[in-house]
Every structure is written in C-alpha cells, then in structure tokens.
C-alpha cells in the first residue's frame, strides 16, 4: 500500500504498542541460509511458493500484476497485469485457481493458475491486504486485527480470528503465510513478523528482521519499501522473506 502521507504517523503510534508486547512475547532468532535475487520494481503485496516456483502479486496503481517467478534467478516466467485502476494485493492458490485481492476496490480476481489467464471476479467488504491457506480454508487480512476465514469455493467469509499481542489487538496485519499450523503475518510499518496461534489468535512469538532491511539509500522509497512477503516451501521446510522493491529474497531458518 502506498500510504506515504500517514505511514510515519502510524509507525509512531504502533511502535509503543509493539514495545509493550515485546515485554511478554519472546523474539525468536533466525539465521540466513541463502539469498536470491528479487525484482526491485516489484512492490510485493503477496507471495507464496508452489511446486518449485514463487508466485508474487505486486501493487501500485497501473503497475499491479500477478507473476510466476524462478526462485534461483528472479526471472519472471509468466505475468498478468491487474486491470487499472485496481491496486493488487495478496494472492493464494486453490487447486487450479490463483486468487488475488485488491486494496480498496472491494474486488478480487481469479486467474487460471497454469496460464494466469483471468477467469472471474468476486467481491468482499472492506480492504483487501493478504491471503494464505491451510488444507480447508483461506485466510484474509484487511489491515485490522482481524483475520477472516473464507470458504475457498465461494470466497465468502465463514469466520474470523481476532489477533492479540500481550492482550491488546494487533492492527496492521499484512502479508500472511500458513506455516506448520500457525499463521505468520507481517506487521505493516515494522520489521516484525508475528507468529500467531490460529486457535486463540494470540501472538506467540515475534521474528524481528530488522537486520535484513536494505540501507535506505539503496531503496527507491524507503518509507514505503518495507518488509512484506512470506513464502514457505513445506516439502523442504524452507521459509522465504522479502520486502517491497527489495533487491533480495532471504531464505531463513528459525531458531528453536
């Protein structure tokens, strides 16, 4: 999301909350296993790994797209533009469909997963930020502390999870990934990923990726080019993270 005018204000309001939460919630360590190239023109809004490839949704008005990417080289193998004036957001795959949210238009798009050819559209209330899935449901963030649970066939909401950290609602939940029975969520305008217990909605640990943030002078727009993007290769237990217009994707290994 571009949100430049008020991003610094939100960050100022959010940091005290996270600092309070950090007093009682552990921060989990990690090591960087490997880095991969990432398109510095890609304003990453959604990311997932499937069958050896990354799938990415990029934002910005008139520049939004969905794409299939070769992990090792960063090469874009397939790409479909999101129609203007829609601002592309989170994506997820369900069987032969690629499902994409848009930011404020209350409209989503469904593509053929194999060809990225547009199939149909769907609607929802509020904003669309991110999508992920488990074996039976989709999960959607909308910038609030609530993660919606969607029926993957109808794309209608069937439940929700209120996310709390240290007893307080945790707003600005952004990119999501389902990892080993937990929800991982980027917290917009921070360098933290929240590990969330989906049964209780409680944040059980933070992953602070501050050390991975590129130097400001290497980013085209440091206030907006923030941490966002989580993908998981379940078969090989590989976790990938990146940010908007970052030059690298990081494969990280979480500590015990």
Predicted regions: what they are:
Residues 23-40, 71-75:
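A short helix->beta-strand "capping" segment at the edge of beta-propeller domains
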Residues 32-37, 75-81, 117-122, 159-168, ...:
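A short beta-strand motif characteristic of beta-propeller blades
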Residues 33-65, 80-92, 243-245:
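Beta-strand-rich domains and repeat architectures in extracellular enzymes and scaffolds
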Residues 40-51, 84-95, 124-136, 141, ...:
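Beta-rich, blade/repeat-based domains predominating
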Residues 70-74, 112-116, 152-155, 197-201, ...:
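Short loop/turn segments that connect beta-strands within beta-propeller blades
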Residues 74-110, 117-128:
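Blade-loop segments of beta-propeller domains
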Residues 108-166:
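Hydrophobic, well-structured mid-protein blocks that either form specific transmembrane helices
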């Amino acid at each position: 999301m571009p949100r430049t005018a008020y991003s610094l204000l939100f960050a100022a309001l959010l940091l005290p909350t996270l600092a309070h939460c950090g007093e009682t919630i552990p921060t989990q360590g990690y090591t960087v296993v490997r880095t991969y190239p990432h398109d510095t023109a890609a304003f990453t809004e959604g990311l997932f790994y499937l069958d050896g490839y990354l799938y990415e949704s990029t934002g910005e008005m008139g520049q939004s797209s969905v794409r299939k990417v070769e992990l090792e080289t960063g090469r874009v193998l397939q790409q479909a533009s999101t129609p203007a004036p829609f601002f592309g957001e989170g994506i997820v795959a369900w069987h032969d469909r690629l499902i994409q949210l848009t930011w404020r238009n209350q409209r989503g798009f469904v593509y053929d997963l194999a060809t990225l050819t547009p199939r149909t559209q769907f609607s929802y209330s509020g904003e669309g930020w991110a999508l992920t899935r488990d074996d039976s449901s989709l999960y959607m963030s909308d910038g609030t502390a609530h993660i919606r649970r969607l029926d993957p066939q109808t794309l209608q909401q069937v439940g929700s999870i209120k996310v709390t950290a240290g007893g307080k609602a945790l707003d600005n939940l952004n990119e999501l990934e389902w990892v080993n029975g937990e929800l991982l969520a980027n917290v917009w305008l921070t360098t933290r990923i929240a590990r969330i217990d989906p049964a209780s909605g409680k944040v059980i640990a933070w992953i602070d990726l501050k050390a991975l943030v590129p130097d400001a002078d290497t980013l085209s727009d440091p206030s907006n080019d923030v941490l966002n993007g989580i993908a998981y290769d379940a078969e090989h237990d590989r976790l990938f993270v990146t940010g908007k217009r970052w030059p690298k994707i990081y494969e990280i290994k979480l500590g015990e």
